[in-house]
Each structure stands twice: as structure tokens, then as C-alpha cells.
């Protein structure tokens, strides 16, 4: 094989860190490693875990995989130069992350939603649509417009914060979308540790769980419908842990999205699930190396 055919992709989310060698021509993940994020330990501890994963992947790599390059996607604001500009979840804003990882190999840093969107554009559900809006629903909520196969970052890298959209529901004070419709939000509203527990309860007919999932999907759909009105995409691709679910949450999301789109023509746009699953983030992070370091 020739050089520059593989890269290490790392996807840092609020719940887990996934890493692996990625074949850049096919998107296949050749090796896969994972650990819990445990962001409450502090940014340095998370960075130490990432360094450990990278070193393990390098030591176990196939002989033909050379040179080493690292692409990292993180659930924070990342500017156009690859600097982490927020510390909402992972406290890396004031850490020299690229310098530390750069001592191992050339490194690029991208927002996780843009990395996921890039992967879906290249190898997943976005291949047939241009432009498309990618919506990630996991521990948090974010979005990205992809046009010509390229995720739109905005002038400063901040064009992703769908989570901050204001939401109003009867009998409650206004709040932001992520506090109501994300995986973390639905678990808190139901008083459990994970969103999966809410889905499990809903599957057993628990009326509170059903109401929480339906209202969350409806709230998110109102925001996604607004995006469709503003951007007029060819399709909406939905990824992340909650984005892969079926049932009442998905049904409410799709129904509410279409109900909040003004144009009758746009109301018919495809709303599809992402194809790459939990590997999308690390695949896209690896692909981002080609855009930032070559």
C-alpha cells in the first residue's frame, strides 16, 4: 500500500471515547478501542486516556500503515484552525492538546458533529444528497450543513449549536433545546441514568416515559423544521445514539419536523437515519486529517 491511506480517528463524546485505525479509501475501521470519557476527572485525565489509546493503536498497527496521522473529533466548539474554544463538557480549552498529540504524530482537531457529517457525506447516508443537514442527537444535540461534501463551519467554526435553540412548552418557562430533547435531558426528566432506560420503560408502556420521548421528539422536530426552512436542504440525515432509535421519539421528530416546514414541497424531503452508526465520529475524525494536515 502507498502512504496516506490510513489514519487514527478519535471520537470524544460526553459518554465515551472511541478510537481506531481507519482506511481512508473505504471508511472501514480496522482496529477499534473504547473507554468511558469520565469528563468529571478533568481535561488532563481525558487527554491522558486519549494519548494511551493512540499509543496502543500505534504499537499494534499493521506494518504497511505508515506514516501515522491523528484526527480527533470532540463535542466542543472548534475554530477553523483546529483549536478547542469551549469547555462545556471536556475541559480542553486551556490545554495544549495539539502540541501534546503532535509530539506523537501530525494531529488535526475538528468538532464531532462536523466529523460525523463528513463521514456520512463520504461513506454514509449523505452520499446521495447535496446539500444535506446532519443532526446529531446523543448526550447533546448539534447540527451541520454539508454542501459539496464539505461540512460548513461558519466564519469562526461555531455553525453547529442547534442545542441552544430556545423552546417553549405550555406551563413551563422557556429553556434551550438540549435541556429538553437530548439523551442526557430525557434521562434527567425521567430520573434515571441513561436514555436507554427511558426507551426501555416506554417499550413496556410507561406513560411518563412515552410522554417524555414524544415531547422531546416534537421539540427537536420544531428546531429541525426551522433549519429546513432556512437552509432548504435536499435531505436531513439524523445520527447519534437517539438518532438511531425507532418508535415514538423518531416518529415525533419526523412528524414535528414536517409540520414545522412552511413549503409544501420541502415538507416531502427525505428524513433518514445515518448509516455509519457509532463509528461515524472516528471515521470522520480520521478523514479530517486530509483536510487539515496535508
What residue spans do the PLM features occupy?
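General beta-strand structural signal in soluble alpha/beta enzymes
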Residues: 107-112
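A short acidic/small-residue loop/turn micro-motif
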Residues: 36-38, 158-161
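ATP-binding/phosphotransfer module of carbohydrate and carboxylate kinases, centering on a glycine-rich
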Residues: 1-69, 78-81, 99-105, 121-133, ...
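Short, small/polar residue-rich loop motifs at catalytic or cofactor-binding pockets
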Residues: 15-16, 138-140
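Short hydrophobic alpha-helix segments
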Residues: 32-35, 88, 155
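A charged helix-plus-loop insertion that forms the helical arch/lid used to bind
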Residues: 83-93
Amino acid at each position: 500500500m502507498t502512504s496516506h491511506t490510513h489514519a487514527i480517528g478519535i471520537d470524544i463524546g460526553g459518554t465515551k471515547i472511541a478510537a481506531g485505525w481507519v482506511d481512508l479509501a473505504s471508511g472501514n475501521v480496522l482496529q477499534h478501542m473504547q473507554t468511558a470519557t469520565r469528563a468529571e476527572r478533568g481535561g488532563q485525565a481525558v487527554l491522558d486516556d486519549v494519548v494511551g489509546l493512540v499509543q496502543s493503536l500505534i504499537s499494534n498497527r499493521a506494518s504497511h500503515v505508515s506514516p501515522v496521522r491523528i484526527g480527533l473529533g470532540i463535542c466542543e466548539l472548534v475554530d477553523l484552525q483546529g483549536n478547542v474554544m469551549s469547555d462545556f463538557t471536556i475541559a480542553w480549552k486551556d490545554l495544549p492538546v495539539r502540541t501534546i498529540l503532535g509530539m506523537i504524530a501530525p494531529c488535526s482537531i475538528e468538532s464531532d458533529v462536523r466529523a460525523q457529517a463528513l463521514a456520512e457525506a463520504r461513506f454514509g447516508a449523505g452520499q446521495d444528497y447535496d446539500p444535506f443537514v446532519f443532526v446529531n442527537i446523543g448526550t447533546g444535540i448539534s447540527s451541520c450543513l454539508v454542501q459539496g461534501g464539505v461540512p460548513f463551519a461558519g466564519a469562526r467554526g461555531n455553525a453547529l449549536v442547534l442545542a441552544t435553540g430556545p423552546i417553549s412548552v405550555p406551563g413551563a418557562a422557556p429553556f434551550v433545546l438540549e435541556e429538553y430533547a437530548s439523551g442526557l435531558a430525557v434521562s434527567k426528566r425521567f430520573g434515571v441514568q441513561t436514555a436507554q432506560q427511558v426507551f426501555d420503560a416506554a417499550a413496556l408502556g410507561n406513560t411518563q416515559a412515552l410522554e417524555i420521548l414524544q415531547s422531546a421528539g416534537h421539540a427537536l422536530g420544531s428546531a429541525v423544521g426551522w433549519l429546513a426552512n432556512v437552509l432548504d436542504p435536499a435531505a436531513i440525515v439524523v445520527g447519534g445514539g437517539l438518532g438511531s432509535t425507532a418508535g415514538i421519539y423518531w416518529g415525533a421528530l419526523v412528524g414535528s419536523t414536517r409540520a414545522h416546514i412552511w413549503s409544501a414541497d420541502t415538507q416531502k424531503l427525505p428524513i433518514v437515519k445515518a448509516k455509519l452508526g457509532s463509528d461515524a465520529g472516528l471515521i470522520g475524525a480520521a478523514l479530517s486529517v486530509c483536510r487539515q494536515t496535508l
